[in-house]
Amino acid sequence: MESSGSAACCPVLQQRARWERKRVCTARELLETERRYQEQLGLVATYFLRILKAKGTLRPPELQTLFGTWELIYAASLELLPYLEEGQWGLGLQGFCPHLELYAQFAANAERSQTTLQAQLKKNKRFRRFVKLQEGRPEFRGLQLQDLLPLPLQRLQQYENLVVALAENTVPNSPDYQQLTRAARLVSETAQKVHAIGQSQKNDQHLLRVQALLSGRKAKGLTSGRWFLRQGWLLVVPPTGEPRPRMFFLFSDVLLMAKPRPPLHLLKSGTFVCRALYPMSQCHLSRVFGHSGGPCGGLLSLSFPHEKLLLMSTDQEELSQWHHSLTLAIRSQKSSTHRSVTAT
């Protein structure tokens, strides 16, 4: 009774009790979700991967591209689960961490996997019939193969949330504190790496799309190696005459101004001709009007060493988004230039 009373009055003991409750709750969630995750990994491995391999419906390179490191990820989960069931969280996660690179490899292959799936569904009748048949099994609960393939990447995000929470609610004098802290750090680093891979893949898709919109000799290789930020129509206000609509593509280092091809152009209808490239490292941006958020739109001024560009939009929200994106690009380029000068 005395011990219980002292615990109720001692803030340190109360805090430790809260940590322990959160730790137990998090560990239970990690265990239960790992069981479900392993079940889904096993279903895909059993009813898709291994049968396809045995039947030879897909050639080995296509099969490897479609599923990537799936079987190895499944094996890693099979190793981890018994430790979680026995409450040996630190030891289990310590043994699991060397397998985290499989998730980075899986992420790097994810775009090619989805492309391969769509291509095979379109051209391979045997594969299409097989996939439809297997997806109809009650074990998959209406999920399609394309919904199941991203499962490891979704689970990695869960790992990060749960393992970090487990480490944060473990007292430093706990036997598995060091193991859990290290595991949380490694899982978070892998999740960040996977996020960067995903961002790079999305950027590559944007660049391919933009490159397809640009035509003419000047357009070749314009998007190579760049980071896409945004695109849209803006009105260019000349010193004299009427404003002219132009399509703008903003990348991390340049602003590309393009003019649409004539609608009746025989070969290039719907594409754009590059008219100018403006380096963001040399840009000074200011908002001439449109600060108040009213309905009249606004005007941006972009000054370069040898040219001044006035861009107008009747949409106040769109202009604000352009101002924000341009500001980020300019700041990033000037910061990069400053670092380069400092390094030399």
Swiss-Prot record:
Single GO biological process annotation from the record: positive regulation of cell migration
Domain DH, residue spans: 22-197
Gene Ontology molecular-function annotations: guanyl-nucleotide exchange factor activity
Keywords recorded for this protein, A-Z: Cell membrane, Guanine-nucleotide releasing factor, Membrane
Highest taxon above the source species: Eukaryota
Chain's role: Promotes cell proliferation.
Protein name, as recorded: Rho guanine nucleotide exchange factor 39
Source taxonomy: Eukaryota, Metazoa, Chordata, Craniata, Vertebrata
